[in-house]
């Protein structure tokens, strides 16, 4: 009998073991779709980004007009740009849901997979930030100024660090050039990290909604989950196309229709919606260094998830107390996102401070306490 090329060829064998004959738990739900959706997002962003980069000029005098030229004169340039800008939003929606799934079902106990995932999130955030600066509109410029300025909070070397990042004494042409370089480079780094992430995942196999070992009940990934994932793609591509074609500027900032002007500060400087929760935490602390540390901690706290797991059960499926805590955390993040978009005025300041405090309290204090308490209640 002739050997099956899919299983014997050195390259095809790897693809086969990752996407075709991969043994998968039979009971994983639609929440396990987001990994492959993130892969689709990455591929779409790299493709549209490559086409945009072909028409973009990384120079302060030309950047804004080169983006306008792409939208007006390049064949389907408007569509490519709208897909790229809104694709970033969908990338973040998917990654946040993917992380939420990981927290809910205890997937963070696969420590290597989880840690590479958090590094992926940080790289994605960096990529999105430098990408937002490239159109060189008002919010691009002032967003870059405000966020890079945070490095000056680092004791002793802060100011040097900022000037080194800027390539001068303010955000200017060198800054734009290096941000374009980084924005081009980082997605390929994300691709590499994704492969590492998948390698670690396939070492242990997927988790499942019950959080129990499922070796006795595995099914091949193709055709079952490849088909299920295709449905997920449809569900993501439909709203993405709707957004890109009907209201492409819904999630953008109107300030970005004005070319960057260092002499005029916009009334409200705020990042894209997917960074608002972290921005709210940054703003809620009146001290600069404290704010920067809280901002970093808001994301880096994910590294601690495996250490804060005290329950004998892996998932939250059969833990109502923990579920209550999880959905409180979700609501809290939505409140932080909303507060981040509001001006720094009376009710919003205190709401932001309370929401920030609640965020860290739930993750650092209540998660381990409730986990231990549930063990007691179940006589574990």
UniProtKB/Swiss-Prot annotation:
Q: Where would you find the membrane-spanning parts of this chain?
A: 34-54, 78-99, 114-134, 179-199, 227-247, 289-309, 321-341, 348-368
Is Zinc-finger a UniProt keyword of this protein?
A: no
Which CDD domains does this UniProt record tie to the protein?
A: cytochrome_b_C, Cytochrome_b_N
- Main localization is mitochondrion
Listed SUPFAM superfamilies: a domain/subunit of cytochrome bc1 complex (Ubiquinol-cytochrome c reductase), Transmembrane di-heme cytochromes
Protein residues bound to a ubiquinone: 202
Q: Which cofactor does it need?
A: heme b
Q: List positions binding heme b b562.
A: 84, 183
Which GO biological process entries does UniProt record here?
mitochondrial electron transport, ubiquinol to cytochrome c
Q: Its Gene Ontology molecular function terms?
A: metal ion binding; ubiquinol-cytochrome-c reductase activity
Q: Which Gene Ontology CC terms are recorded?
A: mitochondrial inner membrane; respiratory chain complex III
The record, for Pfam families, names: Cytochrom_B_C, Cytochrome_B
* CC cofactor note: Binds 2 heme b groups non-covalently.
The record's keywords, sorted A to Z, are: Electron transport, Heme, Iron, Membrane, Metal-binding, Mitochondrion, Mitochondrion inner membrane, Respiratory chain, Transmembrane, Transmembrane helix, Transport, Ubiquinone
Record's keyword annotation contains Iron: yes
Similarity comment: family membership: Belongs to the cytochrome b family.
Other information: Heme 1 (or BL or b562) is low-potential and absorbs at about 562 nm, and heme 2 (or BH or b566) is high-potential and absorbs at about 566 nm.
What functional role does this protein have? Answer: Component of the ubiquinol-cytochrome c reductase complex (complex III or cytochrome b-c1 complex) that is part of the mitochondrial respiratory chain. The b-c1 complex mediates electron transfer from ubiquinol to cytochrome c. Contributes to the generation of a proton gradient across the mitochondrial membrane that is then used for ATP synthesis.
UniProt cross-references to PANTHER family, sorted A to Z: CYTOCHROME B (PTHR19271:SF16)
Q: Report the protein name in the record.
A: Cytochrome b
What lineage does UniProt assign to this protein's organism? Eukaryota, Metazoa, Chordata, Craniata, Vertebrata
